[in-house]
A protein has these predicted regions:
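An alpha-helical support segment within catalytic cores of ATP-dependent transferases
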Residues: 162-208
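Hydrophobic core residues within well-ordered beta-strands of beta-rich domains
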Residues: 47, 208-210
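Conserved catalytic-loop position in the HRD/HxD motif
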Residues: 213
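Conserved ATP-binding subdomain of kinase catalytic cores across diverse folds
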Residues: 1-168, 216, 222-314
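Active-site micro-motifs of SAM-dependent methyltransferase domains
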Residues: 193, 221, 257, 261, ...
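ATP/Mg2+ or Mg2+-diphosphate-binding catalytic cores
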Residues: 283-309, 319-357
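Active-site-adjacent structural elements in folded domains
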Residues: 195-202, 311-319
Length: 357
């Protein structure tokens, strides 16, 4: 892989790939095989990275779209009554054998088994990323005032930017998206307050180096298993910001937003073949999403705690997850309003569910 964008610093993809392969022997990422770096005025600049080829059947995004399409086809094939599907509260953990039979009958078992495997691999990645006590670039660290100032400055700037974007693009929206956009604007003070309510003194968990841009497109499907790749971090962030240690739950939040997108993308791309009202499809999608999240969290939390990864207790986990999902959905909103306004309903729906309006 030759990097198109060159930074006056080591590329995080090189740094993390090498660390996971050589230091932590983490198997579920393409193994680091070499790199081309240039020493320039004391800086180490990464030009290229070589990794082992992982045999695969495409990425997890493509895989999820196919599986979820089958789940929505089942609404008709199995004459499912959407309103009667048992609901699960968002972020409530659930074991696969406790999922109601009506949900298994509709969505099948395979989807939840794959979600469980992905949760396990994600936890193992985080345990590896936070498992070194000698290399200061990777040593876990606590929350502090400096991190909090950095975080709030970034988020409030981004939030203000998105407010301006939504106000300038309301004319592109209609139906549910327009309704949710107005609610977003009505709730802007509460959302801003939510971002400012980050009190590091109450947090007992640790920050580590994370993937930073974790979504289904960054995961390769290998049979029944998954490999994680592309550790470059969030494209909009500076190289310095990408190396800041963050809550591992930020990656989990990114993946949950990707689950949400996969469900809504399936609806938008195939809605003419599903004989249901759009609102009914959205309702079924939200139910499916909550069960996927519940299964993922049950496995992820259990594995993380077994591996001594300090992600905090339940209340802290819920706070960080909501905080990071809100951050991610606000980030997505700007992209959708500028690129494909029809899809703005996806992040707007995500924001509404976190803020509970």
């Amino acid at each position: 892989k030759f990097f198109r964008r060159i930074y006056v610093s080591t590329n995080p993809d090189y740094e993390i790939s090498r660390f996971l392969t050589e230091r932590m022997k983490f198997k579920y990422t393409p193994a680091y095989k070499g790199s081309i770096n240039v020493e320039l005025a004391g800086d180490n600049i990464t030009l290229a990275l070589m990794q082992e080829l992982v045999p695969n059947q495409g990425d997890a995004w493509k895989y999820m779209l196919e599986v979820i399409d089958g789940v929505f086809d089942n609404l008709t094939a199995k004459k499912i009554k959407v309103a009667k599907l048992p609901h699960l509260e968002l972020f409530k953990t659930i074991k696969i054998n406790n999922i109601p039979p009506e949900i298994i009958d509709w969505a099948g078992l395979t989807l939840f088994l794959r979600v469980r495997t992905l949760a396990q691999r994600t936890a193992e990645m985080h345990i590896a990323l936070g498992g070194d006590t000698t290399d200061t670039a990777f040593t876990p660290t606590t929350y502090n005032g400096d991190y909090t100032v950095w975080l709030k400055n970034r988020l409030i700037y981004q939030f203000q930017n998105r407010l301006n974007t939504i106000e300038n693009n309301l004319h592109k929206l209609d139906g549910l998206a327009l309704e949710l956009a107005h609610q977003f604007l009505d709730k802007k003070k509460e959302i801003r307050k939510h971002f400012l309510d980050f009190d590091w003194t109450k947090l007992k968990s640790e920050r580590i180096r994370i993937h930073g841009d974790y979504h289904l497109g960054q995961v390769l499907v290998n049979g029944d298993d998954f490999y994680i790749l592309d550790f470059e971090g969030e494209p909009e962030s500076t190289i310095r910001d990408r190396k800041v240690k963050q809550p591992p739950l930020k990656d989990v939040a990114g993946l949950f937003r990707s689950f949400h997108y996969a469900i809504y993308a399936t609806i938008f791309n195939n809605k003419d073949k599903y004989p249901f009202e759009l609102e009914e499809l959205f309702s079924a999608g939200e139910t499916l999403f909550n069960y996927m999240v519940g299964v993922f969290l049950d496995t992820y939390i259990e594995k993380a705690q077994e591996g001594n990864l300090n992600i905090g207790y339940n209340k802290e986990i819920a706070f960080l997850l909501k905080y990071c999902i809100l951050e991610k959905a606000v980030y997505e909103l700007g992209y959708e309003l500028n690129s494909r306004p029809r899809w703005a309903v996806i992040p707007l729906r995500g924001i509404a569910s976190i803020m509970e309006y």
